[in-house]
Amino acid sequence: MILTSLNLYQYRLPLDVLLPVGKQRIDHRAGLVLQACASTNVGGEYRQVEVEIAPLSGIDVDEQVLVGFSRETLAQVQTALTELLLLLGGQHIDTLLDYAEQSSYPSLAFGLSLLHAKLMGKLDAIRPQTATVPLIYHPTDAGNDLLDNKVAALGMHVHSVKVKVAQTSIEDELSLIYGILRTRPDLKLRLDANRGFTQEQAIEFAACLPLDTIEYIEEPCQNPQDNLEFYQAIGMPYALDESLNDPNYQFAMQNGLTALVIKPMLLGSIEKLANLIETAQSYGVRCIISSSLESSLGISDLTHLAAILTPDEIPGLDTLSAFSQDLVVSSGKKHCLTLAQLEPIAQHAIDSTQQSDLGAAKREEN
């Protein structure tokens, strides 16, 4: 199939509540939507798809730069994509994979490879998981009653929840966790520390928890080299998340390592993700697809991708409740923005004569 048109849009979605990004908070999410049309030839098979490309970078509510997540900025990706559109028009869709492998921006590499997968129809017949792992954290403006009500409202089909820790005081967070377990003692907890504890703090915190209720704790220590000593001291399994963002990261099995929390927007192409997952699973390490706070468009694609790459795991994608509206794909919110309501950034299309020439050239090759 040949790429016949590409359109790039920018979005900015306000959030109804602040979302945690490590220890920081954001009140909106910004990103890009890339739409592509491809056809076999004039009058032949035709497909039109959209993908979200949204590095997790920018400014928090305190006007501080977000740290520890995407290395590239939205402006850098936008510039690269604007230039790339001129090169992609009229090319075979496999060219998307070539540019994905060449890109030094993980969010762009992932977006291009996802665009290729959707144009190829690889996500079409997939039935994604309906189960969720709800995210629980302590919003700055929420009281204990609100959190208790949220936990009490969870359906009995929910068996695990993700809890943000290393955000406030150890005492407050222990109170939060025991409050969750008091309301739903059957729940298993996935704790996410975002490297917020020193080794000593992590050990002190974990020692106060009932180990049999904890599936794992993500990135317990500020220095990931301390994770092994943390595990040896406490026996609580841990998962890696931010560690995967290191461009030099190579999987290495360690005692206590039980899971990789994989954020595709931060890591790169689908091929890179698949290779990492295959390696980790060969050592018995679980792989959990997780969001980078994408909009409904990105979350929809991640649910389908998780069903392909990690069919036996429930992905960690429960972040849409904070969004004020949906984007392109509805998740059930009252408002869903269409492409016509977004800011157009760039576009490129080949005309019918060029399409005919490309079709004729393809027939000659065959």
Residue ranges and their predicted role:
Residues 168-292, 296-300, 304-306, 323-332:
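Catalytic core of soluble alpha/beta enzymes
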Residues 31, 257, 312:
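Active-site lining segments that contact anionic ligands and/or coordinate catalytic metals
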